[in-house]
Amino acid sequence: MLKEIMNTAEDKMSKALLALKKDLASLKAGRANPAMLDKIEAEYYGTMTPLSQLANISVPEARILQIQPWDKSSLKAIEKAILVSDLGLNPNNDGTIIRLIIPELTEETRRNIVKTVKKYGEDTKIAIRSVRRDGNDKIKDLKSDMSEDDIKKAEEEIQKITDNYVKKVDEMIDIKEKEIMSI
């Protein structure tokens, strides 16, 4: 039972870290990255569909994203979805391909992106600590089946797992901050 609680807690913490990785990848950091478009969906035959399912997204140059729809009829819908997104990019549509030119980031924009990165990191840490709290609560529910020492050891083990994941979050945030500020 104890092992199951630990595994569940670690699995949930791992998922929180994976969500952070996705969020960080979707941030505009001055370089073209197909993950920037992960959250954008375009209407395709009446259904909102992720761009990755509508087109091939490539990076021909460091600051250019190229979107080549598999169905040319979806070109306008993709262009519209990009325009209404919060990316702030202007698509160049040549009739077959959409090109997105990623502008150079100003110092102010970089600082705002770093604030967002830190917020994502803090939200992830809160999620990880929440998982720790849930795990500790489940361990305390087993009080009748375990000795005080075993409960203490289990709580310490969950704390070690938590510390490890919080450290990973800090490392990811530091790397992303340096990437944004060094462009």
Curated annotation (Swiss-Prot):
Compartments it resides in: Cytoplasm
InterPro entries from the UniProt entry: Ribosome_recyc_fac, Ribosome_recyc_fac_dom, RRF_sf
Molecular function GO terms recorded: ribosomal large subunit binding
A single Gene Ontology CC term: cytoplasm
Keywords (A to Z) from UniProt: Cytoplasm, Protein biosynthesis
CDD domains per the UniProt record, alphabetical: RRF (cd00520)
Organism domain of life: Bacteria
SUPFAM superfamilies named among the record's database cross-references: Ribosome recycling factor, RRF
Homology family: Belongs to the RRF family.
Function (record text): Responsible for the release of ribosomes from messenger RNA at the termination of protein biosynthesis. May increase the efficiency of translation by recycling ribosomes from one round of translation to another.
Full protein name: Ribosome-recycling factor
Organism: Clostridium tetani (strain Massachusetts / E88)
